[in-house]
């Protein structure tokens, strides 16, 4: 009886220590949703009574598929493919360590900012992202957007550090 209990305890300890880390924790296919807010500040120029000099803009929720594949297991690097439902596809690289992933800076060209019902523009933003994996199935990426936009012939600087992408393993 004591021997059986000892074997059972050893098996439980061995199984509980099998937590994935690094590339193995992140590799796979995910479904994601992203949301957040950016701040736009007009660059000094002529006056405009129609468009404010600064404003916050809540980004529309975006969904898509996220794929993480091994690039170099010795260097802990991965290839990350984000396939947005709007047709935008982003490919970047990242580095995994323990339960954390850091993506190389990438650019988004399809980001749209709308103001009022008649003013809309596409923006170019550079994105930095870091994230963690939870329960071996959910990645939470915190993103920082930095870029420019031209709205009604006025140039704006875009900054956002409250953008999050939550990805769940398929």
How does the language model describe each region?
Residues 1-4, 19:
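Positively charged n-region of N-terminal signal peptides that target proteins for export
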Residues 24-48:
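Tryptophan-anchored aromatic micro-motifs
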Residues 14-17:
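C-terminal motif of bacterial Sec signal peptides marking the signal peptidase cleavage site
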Residues 30-32, 78, 103, 133-147:
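A short hydrophobic beta-strand element
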Residues 39-54, 109-118, 150-156:
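Flexible, solvent-exposed loop segments that connect beta-strands
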Residues 57-129:
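Predominantly extracellular/secreted and cell-surface proteins with exposed
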Residues 5-10:
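Sec-dependent signal peptide hydrophobic core
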Residues 136-170:
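Edge beta-strand at a domain terminus
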């Amino acid at each position: 009886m004591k021997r059986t209990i000892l074997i059972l305890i050893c098996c439980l300890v061995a199984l509980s220590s099998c937590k994935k880390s690094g590339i193995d924790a992140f590799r796979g296919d995910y479904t994601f949703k992203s949301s957040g807010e950016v701040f736009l500040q007009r660059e000094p120029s002529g006056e405009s009574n129609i468009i404010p000099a600064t404003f916050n803009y809540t980004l529309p929720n975006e969904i898509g598929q996220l794929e993480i594949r091994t690039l170099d297991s010795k260097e802990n690097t991965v290839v990350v493919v984000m396939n947005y439902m709007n047709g935008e596809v982003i490919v970047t690289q990242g580095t995994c360590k323990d339960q954390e992933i850091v993506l190389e800076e990438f650019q988004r060209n399809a980001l749209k900012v709308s103001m009022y019902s008649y003013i809309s523009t596409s923006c170019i933003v550079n994105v930095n992202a870091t994230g963690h994996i939870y329960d071996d199935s959910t990645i939470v990426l915190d993103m920082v957007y930095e870029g420019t936009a031209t709205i009604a012939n006025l140039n704006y600087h875009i900054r956002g550090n409250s953008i999050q992408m939550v990805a769940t393993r398929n």
